[in-house]
């Protein structure tokens, strides 16, 4: 346990107001022994502060678990509490280490650092806490709101008609099928909402944080739009009822259509005013609407028990009758909508309102409790009400009635048909002529007619429609506000601003109002409803899929406290929601899915920088893990060989050409790892290692290079590369090729660095790697051109100064991207391959993969091989035959018969002058002196080594002459890398070979040597 000296008085409560001070944390004093536990001070065990260094009675900066350490935010005016970092607990305590802790503290606002304390008591803040926003419980905030949104105009005006068409049995099936979808969705949303702290944004917040910004953003936008259109639908339903009343009393305003528009616009304006008054007033209005609906229900039920008057009897109401109930059990389809799915499509929108409570999640006291409890209770009670009304009204009212008081049964006036005959009424004439204006199947206002006092039903219609419209208005603005704050789409941030203590989305209300007015102009309920239903169903499908996907990923982060859900039920809910979308209105379903896909593709293209820990991310990990483990069971086969490259880039932005070259042929094909060795003491380079890794990865992503970045700390370069070659990769996904840049300054650099460079190539062969060395005429390192050497992020040791740990890794991403030859079109040039020695085919495979890419596809590939002048035709045919079996598409083959001729004298002398400074000149020295010189300078070339390697040295000089003759204008030159035997070829001689081989060549030169194992085959198994 980390301990600190007791520097304050133990009993002084005023000093125990924080966890620790920076000065105490970084004190260089020797720690004192742990303080003994004092039972007279129980606060030692209960006080959350460790400023007095008392945790379980010990003198330590280690802290006990507390809520604040895991919270992302604090209450207004309260300081943020932080736990000590790992460095705080186990690093040396000294003043020089202050910069190690600065990052942890400086990120907080200045008001959180009071009097040098890391944290203080909330009561010490001089700022007065702002007024608390209004928060609602599960009844007022969720259940009532959901019930009001579920109940709507269909309950009063269409449910009796649906019962008459489908019969009581099928109506119950329609209701229960609809409730099945909403109940499964309710269970799914309950699970999602209890898997962590829920903020404002409702359905959008839940889906986006579960499935990610791609699907979440698209569904959030259309869900907000659907709610805005829902305002229009419900107000139009309200306006239709008012218009009918005006016409009944002979007081129309203008004409039927414009009356609806006028009434609806006035109504939605009043609802806007209620919303702008704040959530508190909106909630009061909802409670008032709820009471009105409850009174209307009671009024209806009482009315069914009252014996019918003559007026009601003439309209088909006869109170509870068994024969009426039996007759209305079976369907009687009429009209164009007279089908099961026709009735289902009309009823289903009345079940969609279960998200009203979740949509104001930011205004709930405890969303994790309120959303599941309130939503499921709302579904239960509204289902009971639908079933009860369908059964009761189907037991009281016949399907057809004339409404004429004189249509009583009169003896001698012919046959009387129908159940009404037994009750003294004859509706035969209007039934046969299909001219009845009343009855369950003809009169939409049947509930008003049956009720004890008709105006109360009208008031219930008003309450149901206006409350639903108000809930939709609030939901649209709240969801859209959260979407705007996340900035997933352009040009909408303006509407995200909140006002007042509740952060009311005033601008969102105005936008929803404008959309509602635009759709109110349509003034046709049957045109508006299908679009909304499909958007809501699309939301339900994604909510259920979110729950299913989060469950199957087995992510440790999926721990919902609501356990009464099932992943397969959630999947069924998602599928059935999509099916219902097409059953309701196929064209509206296609529109909804098309909009979702368009918005989805936009967010995928933009790649917003958000990280919400979505189940999609967890699923990606699961897939990667599963396939990676599965690869362990796959035996290696030549046909499945892929060039998996470990590229020694250092900081990738230093050598963009090297990154682009490898990234071109490995893209969507194989593994690429950019390796970076930080040289120096582990303690010194560790802060830099932690800071820059993420920045380099983002740089690669910005450059559209599909690669990993891996860095290690080592005492020297060679040891670091050895670590990378042994540890990089995972399972079968391990590098098999080492790619390095050519050491251009080898003649002027310290010989030890050259020794390390060549040693790295030898190590690669020892680890059975292939080797690829890339040389460009202008060099690979662009750090000086970018002036990166003055930035400690890029190379902190370059100026010989200690790197500061305070570095902004975003500088790596924001820097200007250097362009390279591998990013441009190559045109109709050539890729020349000098396949001088058989390395297993890697020298052929890399250019082939490069030639498949669009920028290199127009290049003609030429293959050059060595041969004898008297066997040129035979050798050429043999190579062409071999290449055709490899199916590489290489048809132009050139034999080099003069490869073993002596080079020109001036070129030979140039080579000798190149190695002269590195010669040991041991011809006249004794053996002891030579051995000592060799031990001190292993890179030196002895006379014996020059003699033994003379033929090989002259071959490199001659090859350079040949390449200059044939490939001066090529786009790329690929040459088999010569190998120097360990212990027989000094590093300086080997570097001279590579220098000579690629000297004066204008195109990029790639020196490749495989590990002498086949990477190409012409067999099919």
From Swiss-Prot:
The modification Phosphoserine is found at residues 43, 49, 73, 91, 126. Residues 244-255, 304-338, 394-453, 523-527 are extracellular. Changing residue 1010 to R: In GTLMNS; uncertain significance. It catalyses: chloride(out) + Na(+)(out) = chloride(in) + Na(+)(in). The keyword Signal does not apply. Disulfide bonds join 416-421, 430-436. Changing residue 55 to A: Decreased phosphorylation by OXSR1/OSR1 and STK39/SPAK. Changing residue 765 to A: Reduced sodium and chloride ion cotransporter activity. Changing residue 919 to C: Increases sodium transport. Changing residue 751 to L: In GTLMNS; 54% residual Na(+) uptake activity; no effect on localization at the plasma membrane. Changing residue 121 to D: In GTLMNS; 27% residual Na(+) uptake activity; increased MAPK1/3 (ERK1/2) phosphorylation in response to IL18; no effect on localization at the plasma membrane. Residues 615-630 are annotated as: Scissor helix. Changing residue 240 to A: Strongly reduced sodium and chloride ion cotransporter activity. Chloride binds at residues 353-355, 540. It is a multi-pass membrane protein. Changing residue 149 to A: Reduced sensitivity to thiazide diuretics. Reduced sodium and chloride ion cotransporter activity. The modification Phosphothreonine is found at residues 46, 50, 55, 60, 124. Electroneutral sodium and chloride ion cotransporter, which acts as a key mediator of sodium and chloride reabsorption in kidney distal convoluted tubules. Also acts as a receptor for the pro-inflammatory cytokine IL18, thereby contributing to IL18-induced cytokine production, including IFNG, IL6, IL18 and CCL2. May act either independently of IL18R1, or in a complex with IL18R1. Homodimer; adopts a domain-swap conformation at the scissor helices connecting the transmembrane domain and C-terminal domain. Interacts with KLHL3. Interacts with IL18R1; this interaction is increased by IL18 treatment. This is Solute carrier family 12 member 3. It comes from Homo sapiens (Human). The gene is SLC12A3.
């Amino acid at each position: 346990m980390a301990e600190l000296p007791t520097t304050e008085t133990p009993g002084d409560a005023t000093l125990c107001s924080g966890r620790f001070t920076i000065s105490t944390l970084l004190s260089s004093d020797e720690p004192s022994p742990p303080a003994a536990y004092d039972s007279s001070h129980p606060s030692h065990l209960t006080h959350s502060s460790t400023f007095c260094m008392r945790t379980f009675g010990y003198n330590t900066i280690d802290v006990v678990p507390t809520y604040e350490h895991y919270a992302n935010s604090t209450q207004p005016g309260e300081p943020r509490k932080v736990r000590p970092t790992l460095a705080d607990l186990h690093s040396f305590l000294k003043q020089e280490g202050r910069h190690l802790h600065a990052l942890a503290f400086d990120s907080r606002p200045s008001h959180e650092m009071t009097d040098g304390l890391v944290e203080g008591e909330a009561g010490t803040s001089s700022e007065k806490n702002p007024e608390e926003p209004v928060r609602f419980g599960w009844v007022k905030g969720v259940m009532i709101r959901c019930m009001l949104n579920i109940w709507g105009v269909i309950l009063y005006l269409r449910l009796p008609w649906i019962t008459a068409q489908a019969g009581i049995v099928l109506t119950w099936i329609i209701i229960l099928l609809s409730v099945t979808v909403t109940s499964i969705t309710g269970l799914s949303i309950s699970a999602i909402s209890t898997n962590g702290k829920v903020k404002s944004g409702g359905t959008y917040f839940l889906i986006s944080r579960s499935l990610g910004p791609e699907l979440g953003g698209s569904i959030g936008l259309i869900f907000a739009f659907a709610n805005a259109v829902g305002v229009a639908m419900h107000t139009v339903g309200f306006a239709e009822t008012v218009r009918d009343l005006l016409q009944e009393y002979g007081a129309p305003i203008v004409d039927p259509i414009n009356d609806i528009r006028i009434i609806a616009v006035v109504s939605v304006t009043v609802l806007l005013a209620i919303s702008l008054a704040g959530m508190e007033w909106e909630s009061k209005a909802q409670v008032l609407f709820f009471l009105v609906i409850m009174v209307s229900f009671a009024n209806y039920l009482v009315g069914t028990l009252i014996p019918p008057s003559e007026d009601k009897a003439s309209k088909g109401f006869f109170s509870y009758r068994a024969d009426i109930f039996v007759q209305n059990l079976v369907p009687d389809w009429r009209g164009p909508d007279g089908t099961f799915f026709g009735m289902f499509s009309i009823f289903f929108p009345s079940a969609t309102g279960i998200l009203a409570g979740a949509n104001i999640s930011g205004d709930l006291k405890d969303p994790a409790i309120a959303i599941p409890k309130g939503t499921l209770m709302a579904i239960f009670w509204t289902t009971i009400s639908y079933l009860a009304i369908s059964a009761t009204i189907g037991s009281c009212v016949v399907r057809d009635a004339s409404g004429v008081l004189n249509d009583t049964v009169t003896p001698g006036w012919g046959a009387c048909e129908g159940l009404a005959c037994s009750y003294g009424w004859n509706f035969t004439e209007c039934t046969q002529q299909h001219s009845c204006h009343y009855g369950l199947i003809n009169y939409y206002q049947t509930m008003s007619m049956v009720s004890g006092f008709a105006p109360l039903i009208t008031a219930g219609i008003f309450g149901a429609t206006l409350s639903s419209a108000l809930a939709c208005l609030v939901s649209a603005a709240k969801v859209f506000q959260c979407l705007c704050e996340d900035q997933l789409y352009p040009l909408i941030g303006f509407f995200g601003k909140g006002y007042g203590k509740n952060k009311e989305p005033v601008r969102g209300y105005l936008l929803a109002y404008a959309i509602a007015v635009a759709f109110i102009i349509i003034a046709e309920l049957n045109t508006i409803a299908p679009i909304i239903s499909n958007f809501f169903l699309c939301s339900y499908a994604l909510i259920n899929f979110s729950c299913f996907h989060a469950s199957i990923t087995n992510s440790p982060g999926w721990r919902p406290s609501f356990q009464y859900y099932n992943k397969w039920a959630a999947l069924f809910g998602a599928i059935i929601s999509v099916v219902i979308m097409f059953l309701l209105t196929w064209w509206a379903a296609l529109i909804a899915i098309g909009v979702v896909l368009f918005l989805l593709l936009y967010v995928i293209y933009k790649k917003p920088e958000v990280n919400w820990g979505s189940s999609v991310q967890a699923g990606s990990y699961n897939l990667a893990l599963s396939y990676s483990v599965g690869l362990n069971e796959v035996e290696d086969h030549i046909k499945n060989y892929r060039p998996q490259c470990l590229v020694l880039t250092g900081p990738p932005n230093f050598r963009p050409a090297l990154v682009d070259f490898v990234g071109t042929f490995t893209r969507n094909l194989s593994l690429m790892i950019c390796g970076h060795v930080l040289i120096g003491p582990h303690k010194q380079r560790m802060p830099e290692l932690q800071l820059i890794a993420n920045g380099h990865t983002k740089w690669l992503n910005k450059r559209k290079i599909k690669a990993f970045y891996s860095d290690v700390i080592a005492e020297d370069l060679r040891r670091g590369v050895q670590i990378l070659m042994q540890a990089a990769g995972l399972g079968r996904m391990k590098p098999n090729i080492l790619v390095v840049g050519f050491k251009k300054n080898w003649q002027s650099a310290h010989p030890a660095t050259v020794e390390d460079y060549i040693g790295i190539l030898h190590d690669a062969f020892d680890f059975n790697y292939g080797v690829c060395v890339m040389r460009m005429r202008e060099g690979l390192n662009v750090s000086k051109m970018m002036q990166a050497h003055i930035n400690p992020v890029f190379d902190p040791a370059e100026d010989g100064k200690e790197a500061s740990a305070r570095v902004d890794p975003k500088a790596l991403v924001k820097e200007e991207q250097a362009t390279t030859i591998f990013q441009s079109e190559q045109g109709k040039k050539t890729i020349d391959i000098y396949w001088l020695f058989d390395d297993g085919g890697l020298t052929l495979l890399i250019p082939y993969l490069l030639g498949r890419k669009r920028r290199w596809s127009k290049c003609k590939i030429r293959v050059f091989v060595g041969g004898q002048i008297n066997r040129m035709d035979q050798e050429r045919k043999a190579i062409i035959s071999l290449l055709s079996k490899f199916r590489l598409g290489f048809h132009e083959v050139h034999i080099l018969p003069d490869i073993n001729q002596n080079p020109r004298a001036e070129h030979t002398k140039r080579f000798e002058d190149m190695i002269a400074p590195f010669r040991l000149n041991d011809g006249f020295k004794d053996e002891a002196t030579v051995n000592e010189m060799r031990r001190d300078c292993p890179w030196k070339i002895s006379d014996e080594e020059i003699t033994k390697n003379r033929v090989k040295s002259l071959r490199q000089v001659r090859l350079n002459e040949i390449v200059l003759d044939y490939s001066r204008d090529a786009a790329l030159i690929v040459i088999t890398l010569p190998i120097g035997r360990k212990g027989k070829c000094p590093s300086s001689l080997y570097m001279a070979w590579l220098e000579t081989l690629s000297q004066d060549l204008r195109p990029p030169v790639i020196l490749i040597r495989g590990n002498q194992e086949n990477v190409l085959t012409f067999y099919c198994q």
